[in-house]
Design a protein with these regions (language model features):
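Structural signal for alpha-helical transmembrane segments and their membrane-water exit/capping regions
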Residues: 3-34, 44-61, 185-188, 224-252, ...
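N-terminal membrane topogenic signal
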Residues: 1-17, 76-77, 207-217, 361
Length: 382
């Protein structure tokens, strides 16, 4: 039993800690009807729908085909590297940062192994670190790019245009820095033959044709979700439609949803709600954060990750714009600052466990550099 709990804790560390915190908070605030008011059902419903839709589109093969067509039209090793990074940056705005990494990091590893050994070894860790930063910083531009944006955007009552305007300077700066990094890295790369591209070399096998029914259905459902994000229709409509469609036509997709993330949200909602009913803690945190919401969010994200930080801190301030900036910048830094970063780390560990330390060094150093630039921009804009 203890062994099973240990295995579960290692696999779902954030969820486990969130549940423990929620349970501990119940000693101070006994369960009652007010618990139901803690939970943001709109955010949970939208998050479920978006995860289900993106999982469905990924299973159909939409992203593989898109990547294949783009890569086949790109010339040279540096061009392919640049495109793999930019795919993470731009598509994370729509399919979320974690899905972008799950989709394109394996593709990058396949392509790197097709390079001459010296060149492949040079790019292996760098491109994964680049993709991770690109996904985290690209996703901050839209309400649906990452979970903390979706939640804080809803709490703030902002329009999509307001959030995009708020984060555009940061995303634009991040894009410029990424392109500079790629060019600097390319200039230092070993001078060996370029990547010759064909369908097999790029790691794509022949695929069966797209299931047009699934593709059309999930694109329609995605459009309905966007209408909900824009507050044109209530969240219950896409939630019911997604559930009905999956139950009737695509049941296997139900298992592809990240339920541990939804459970983490629920546990943290309970924990934060209970803390808000403890006057001493509530007043203490409000004093600590007053006028320092962004920096508090950046620091908190380094320890507990930016999604839990967004959920926790939102209970003690109404300066949601500062939290949006802080939790997005806070996704840089430590490996756990953004849980999406762990996805890339796991791929590297699976590739070669001996590379974990070296990757962590490259990842941390590059994250700190990007964070410094983002913080300089924040102080300039405030």
């Amino acid at each position: 039993m203890l062994q099973k709990l240990y295995v579960f804790f290692r696999k779902e560390t954030v969820l486990s800690i969130a549940v423990i915190l929620a349970l501990l908070s119940m000693f101070w605030v006994r369960p009652d009807k007010a618990y139901f008011t803690y939970i943001d059902f709109r955010t949970l419903g939208l998050l479920f729908c978006l995860m289900a839709i993106v999982a469905g589109l990924k299973a159909v093969g939409v992203f593989d085909i898109l990547a294949q067509k783009l890569l086949m039209g790109t010339s040279g090793t540096v061009g392919v590297i640049r495109l793999l990074v930019l795919l993470c940056f731009f598509l994370s705005m729509v399919i979320t940062n974690d899905v972008a990494l799950i989709t394109f990091v394996p593709l990058a590893l396949i392509i790197v192994h097709k390079l001459p050994k010296e060149l492949g070894n040079y790019w292996l860790l760098k491109i994964v670190a680049m993709q991770t930063i690109a996904a985290n910083l690209g996703s901050m531009l839209t309400p649906i790019g990452n979970p903390q944006n979706l939640y804080l955007y809803a709490r703030a009552g902002m329009s999509a245009a307001e959030l995009i305007t708020l984060m555009l300077p940061y995303s634009a700066t991040a894009l410029i820095l990424l392109l500079i990094w790629i060019q600097v890295a390319a200039a230092k790369a070993p001078h060996v033959c370029s990547l010759e591209k064909d369908k097999t070399l790029l790691g794509f096998s022949d695929r069966k044709e797209l299931n047009m029914e699934y593709l059309a259905a999930y694109l329609i459902l995605f459009t309905i979700c966007l209408l909900t994000v824009a507050r044109i229709i209530p969240y219950q409509i896409p939630l019911v439609l997604v559930l009905i469609y999956m139950l009737l036509r695509n049941r296997e997709n139900i298992s592809r949803v990240d339920y541990s993330l939804l459970a983490t949200f629920i546990a943290l909602f309970i924990f934060i709600g209970n803390l808000g009913r403890i006057p001493q803690f509530s007043s203490f945190l409000e004093r600590i954060m007053a006028g320092r919401e962004t920096l508090t969010a950046v620091l908190a994200s380094q320890i507990m990750s930016n999604v839990p930080a967004a959920l926790l801190l939102s209970g003690f301030t109404d300066n949601y714009r500062a939290l949006i900036v802080g939790t997005n910048i806070g996704g840089l830094g430590t490996l756990i600052a953004s849980m999406a970063s762990l996805i890339s780390f796991k791929y590297i560990a699976k590739e070669n466990r001996n590379l974990r330390g070296k990757y962590l060094g490259i990842f941390t150093a590059s994250n700190i550099i990007f964070m410094i630039f983002m913080l300089i921009l924040y102080f300039f804009l405030r």
